[in-house]
Each structure stands twice: as structure tokens, then as C-alpha cells.
Design a protein with these regions (language model features):
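Non-catalytic terminal extensions of PLP-dependent enzymes
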Residues: 1-177
């Protein structure tokens, strides 16, 4: 969501106003908070039924890889191993679809699991603790790995091959057959 609307912080507005006013969900051309390009004013809006998280690893304003990152696929695997199935994950974003049937307990579970993953990442927990199923299935490959080791290895691969640029090109009209 845009950090500001009409020069005021997004979250300073009353919920009722946000719920009824599309200005709070606009993708403004050229804005740095979303990283999208090549579209016109009022062409796209944030879908309030989609919860998209961007994982660390890419500086959105500069479009450059940072030294360390958390590939979204790793967070997605952690969530799946803990009974939460994201709609999709790509290089550095993970999407959840929210329906009117979602209850507070389900949302709190999602937030708590993401916060727990962050604590495990900060503690550089052993991979066997963070992703036990993945570890068990590939114990020899991941012996002595920590969660940060796995994140760094995959992030370095993304950075070495500039996968974000390849992914972006895949969806450009000029690249289509």
C-alpha cells in the first residue's frame, strides 16, 4: 500500500474512510514503494483481498540486490511445514489470499508463524530445526546448515544470475513469442 495518501500517513486515516476510498489502494506511476513500471494513472489498484509480503534481499528503490536476502520460497516452505499454504511465492515475494471467511485466529497464526520464522532467522537456527522435513529428505546435502546458510546460498544464486531481471523480462511483451 502507498505509505502516504494526500501527504498524510496511510494508517492515520479512519478505517471506514480507507475501506470506501480507492485512493488508498492506487498504484501511482513512478512511485518507488511498489517497483512496478510502464502503466498509466488509475490503471491498477492494490487488491485488499491479497496479502503480499516482500522478503528481504532487494532494495526496491534502487532495484539492486542487497548482500543478504531471504528467498520467499524458503519462507513458503517453512509455512507449509507448519500447516500454512501460501497462494504462491516467487523470488522475493509471497502471496496469501484473504477471503471473507478468514477469522482472526487464522490471521494471528499466520502472523505468529512469520514472526517465529524471523526469530529463527535472527538466531541463525539449524536448518534441521527450521525446515525439518526438507532437512530429513536431504540430510546429507544440508548437514550442518543453518537457516541463514540456506538463505544466503539461494540469494547468492539469484544475485549471480540476476534472476529478478530474467523474471521481469519473462513478462514483458517484447519477450513473448
Amino acid at each position: 500500500i502507498p505509505p502516504e495518501v494526500d501527504g498524510k500517513p496511510w494508517d492515520s486515516y479512519p478505517t471506514e474512510q480507507i475501506a470506501r476510498d480507492l485512493r488508498f489502494f492506487k498504484y501511482e506511476p513512478g512511485a518507488k514503494w511498489h517497483g512496478f513500471e510502464d502503466y498509466g494513472p488509475d490503471q491498477y489498484f492494490v487488491d485488499p483481498c491479497k496479502f503480499l509480503l516482500t522478503t528481504p534481499g532487494i532494495n526496491i528503490e534502487r532495484g539492486e540486490y542487497e548482500p543478504f536476502g531471504v528467498p520467499a520460497g524458503i519462507l513458503a516452505e517453512y509455512l507449509r511445514e507448519n500447516g500454512i499454504v501460501p497462494e504462491k511465492a516467487d523470488l522475493n515475494s509471497i502471496l496469501f489470499l484473504m477471503t471473507p471467511a478468514e477469522d482472526l485466529a487464522k490471521m494471528e497464526n499466520l502472523v505468529n508463524r512469520i514472526a517465529h520464522f524471523e526469530r529463527l532467522l535472527d538466531a541463525n537456527a539449524p536448518l534441521s530445526e527450521v525446515l525439518p522435513v526438507l532437512y530429513r529428505n536431504h540430510a546429507e546435502r544440508y548437514r550442518d546448515y543453518t537457516i541463514r546458510d540456506l538463505c544466503q546460498e539461494l540469494h547468492d544464486y539469484y544475485r549471480e544470475y540476476d534472476l529478478k531481471s530474467i523474471q521481469k523480462a519473462m513478462f514483458r511483451k517484447d519477450e513473448l513469442p
